[in-house]
C-alpha cells in the first residue's frame, strides 16, 4: 500500500482533497488547483503496511558496520549516506525532494518528539531511501500531531534504523566524504554485503525526472496585487521544488509550475511568462537527462534578457550554462545554520541549505571537494553573459551565489524560503519581484 500511495502522490497530480493549495486565498483567484501533502494519507486514515522491527545492521562501502534497531517500513535502505544538522524540521527534510537517492542521517539525537503535522510537508512524497536516527520518538507530544514519524515512513515505504551512533557516522562522513551504504535486518548480513557490492551511485540516475511534476499547471490563475493589477507571470521549472518555494513565489507572481523539460518556446509563446525560475533538486547537475534540459532553457532565457532566478540545483545549472564546472563536495551542506557572505555588501546571512554539489569558483577552483574528484567536464558559456561570484560560504569559501553582469538574473545555492531554517535570506524573493517589475 505504501508504494502505491507514494506513486499516487507524486508532485504531478492535482487532487480535490490535497493540503497544498496556496492560490486558494489569493486576490483574484477563483479556481486554484490543490495537491497532495505527503502526510495526507495519515489524515485520511489509510491502512499502513507492517512496521519493521528487530535488530538491524548498517554497512558502508568503506567498511563501516553499525548495529541498531529497525523502524519505519520493512525492507532495505540503500543509497548515499549523508547527514543533516537541523535540530527541528524533520518532516520538511523527509519530504524535501533534494534528498532523493540518499540515506538521511539526523545528527540531532531525538527525532519525532512533536510528531507529524497535516499540511506541513514540502512535497507529496518522502524522498530519502532510508532514515538513520539515534532515537525515534514513538509517542509524540504535540496538540497538532496526527501520527509519529515512523508512520510517515511506513506510508511511503521508507525503512529506518535507530539506536545508531550517529555521531560516529557524522565524523566518518566529514572526514572521508559521503559514501554508499545499505541497512536492513541483522540476520541478512550476507545479503546486505552482496547488495552493497552491487550498488551503483544514485548520481547515475535521472533523479530530477523522479521528483518533478509531469505537466504544467497554473497555481494561482488570475492572481492580482493589492491594487487589483495582474501579477507578473513566472515560469517555475520544477527540478524537485519545495512547496514553500511555491508559496513564496505565489506571493509575488502568477506561477506556472512546469516540468524541467519545458522548452523556452512553450514558456514564452504558450504561457507568455515575464520571468523564469529554476528550483532546487537532487542528483548530479551535469546529468544528461532532465537537468540538462532545464539548463538549456535557462541559457535561452538569459539570451532573451528575461529575468531569471535559480535556487540550489537551479544555481548549479546556471553555473553550467555559464561555462563553469560543478563538482561533488566532501560531505555537502545540509542543515539550517550555514553562514553566507554577500561579497557586494559584506553582510553575513545564516541560511538553510541542502546540497552535495557546488559550482567551482572561477579563481579558487573546487573547494571542499569529495575525495573521488567527481566533477562535470569543462563546458562553454551557452548564454554569453559575464558571470561573477556574489555570495560565498563563510566556513569553506565555496560559491553560494552568482550574478549575471548586465542581465536581470541571479542565482543562490542556499534556500531563502528556509523551511525549515532562518529567514535571513527571505527578502531575495521580493528583490527578484523588483527586478521583474523593472524589466517589464
Where are these regions (language model features)?
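Catalytic beta-strand/loop cores that center a nucleophilic Ser/Cys/Thr
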Residues: 347-406, 440
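Proline-centered loop/turn at the N-terminus of a beta-strand
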Residues: 159, 233, 307-309, 325, ...
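Active-site-proximal beta-strand elements of phosphoester/diester hydrolases
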Residues: 233-238, 351-352, 410-414
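A glycine-centered loop/beta-turn motif at secondary-structure junctions
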Residues: 401-439
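Residue-level structural signal for beta-strand termini and adjacent loop
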Residues: 70-72, 109, 354, 404, ...
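Cysteine-nucleophile active-site neighborhood
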Residues: 270-362, 421-431, 435
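RNA-binding accessory domains that recognize and position tRNA/RNA substrates
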Residues: 2-13, 17-18, 22, 27-265, ...
Amino acid at each position: 500500500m505504501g508504494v502505491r500511495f507514494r506513486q499516487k502522490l507524486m508532485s504531478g497530480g492535482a487532487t480535490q482533497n490535497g493540503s497544498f493549495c496556496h492560490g486558494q486565498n489569493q486576490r483574484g483567484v477563483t479556481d486554484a488547483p490543490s495537491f497532495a501533502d505527503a502526510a495526507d494519507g495519515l489524515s485520511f486514515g489509510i491502512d499502513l503496511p507492517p512496521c519493521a522491527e528487530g535488530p538491524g545492521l548498517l554497512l558502508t562501502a568503506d567498511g563501516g558496520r553499525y548495529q541498531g534497531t529497525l523502524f519505519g517500513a520493512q525492507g532495505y535502505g540503500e543509497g548515499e549516506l549523508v547527514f543533516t544538522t537541523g535540530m527541528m524540521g524533520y518532516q520538511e527534510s523527509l519530504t524535501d525532494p533534494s534528498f532523493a537517492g540518499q540515506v538521511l542521517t539526523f545528527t540531532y539525537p531525538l527525532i519525532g518528539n512533536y510528531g507529524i503535522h497535516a499540511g506541513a510537508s514540502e512535497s507529496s512524497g518522502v524522498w530519502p531511501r532510508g532514515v538513520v536516527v539515534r532515537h525515534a520518538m514513538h509517542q509524540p507530544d504535540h496538540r497538532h500531531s496526527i501520527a509519529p514519524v515512523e508512520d510517515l515512513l511506513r506510508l511511503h515505504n521508507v525503512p529506518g534504523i535507530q539506536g545508531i551512533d550517529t555521531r560516529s557516522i557524522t565524523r566518518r562522513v566529514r572526514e572521508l566524504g559521503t559514501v554508499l551504504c545499505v541497512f536492513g535486518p541483522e540476520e541478512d548480513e550476507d545479503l546486505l554485503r552482496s547488495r552493497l557490492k552491487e550498488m551503483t551511485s544514485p548520481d547515475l540516475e535521472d533523479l530530477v525526472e523522479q521528483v518533478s511534476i509531469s505537466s504544467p499547471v497554473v497555481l494561482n490563475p488570475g492572481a492580482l496585487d493589492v491594487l487589483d493589477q495582474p501579477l507578473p507571470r513566472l515560469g517555475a521549472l520544477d527540478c524537485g521544488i519545495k512547496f514553500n518555494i511555491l508559496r513564496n513565489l505565489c506571493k509575488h507572481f502568477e506561477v506556472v509550475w512546469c516540468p524541467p523539460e519545458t522548452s523556452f518556446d512553450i514558456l514564452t509563446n504558450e504561457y507568455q511568462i515575464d520571468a523564469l525560475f529554476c528550483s532546487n533538486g537532487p542528483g548530479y547537475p551535469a546529468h544528461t537527462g532532465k537537468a540538462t534540459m532545464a539548463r538549456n532553457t535557462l541559457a535561452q532565457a538569459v539570451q532573451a534578457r528575461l529575468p531569471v532566478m535559480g535556487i540550489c540545483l537551479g544555481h548549479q545549472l546556471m553555473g553550467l550554462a555559464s561555462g563553469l564546472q560543478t563538482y561533488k563536495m566532501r560531505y555537502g551542506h545540509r542543515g539550517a545554520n550555514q553562514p553566507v557572505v554577500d561579497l557586494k555588501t559584506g553582510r553575513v546571512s545564516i541560511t538553510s541549505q541542502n546540497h552535495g554539489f557546488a559550482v567551482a569558483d572561477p579563481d579558487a577552483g573546487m573547494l571542499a571537494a569529495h575525495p573521488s574528484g567527481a566533477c562535470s567536464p569543462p563546458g562553454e558559456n551557452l548564454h554569453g553573459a559575464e558571470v561573477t561570484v556574489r555570495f560565498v560560504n563563510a566556513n569553506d569559501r565555496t560559491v553560494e551565489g552568482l550574478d549575471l553582469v548586465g542581465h536581470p538574473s541571479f542565482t543562490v545555492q542556499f534556500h531563502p524560503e528556509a523551511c525549515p531554517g532562518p529567514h535571513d535570506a527571505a527578502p531575495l524573493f521580493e528583490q527578484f519581484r523588483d527586478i521583474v517589475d523593472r524589466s517589464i
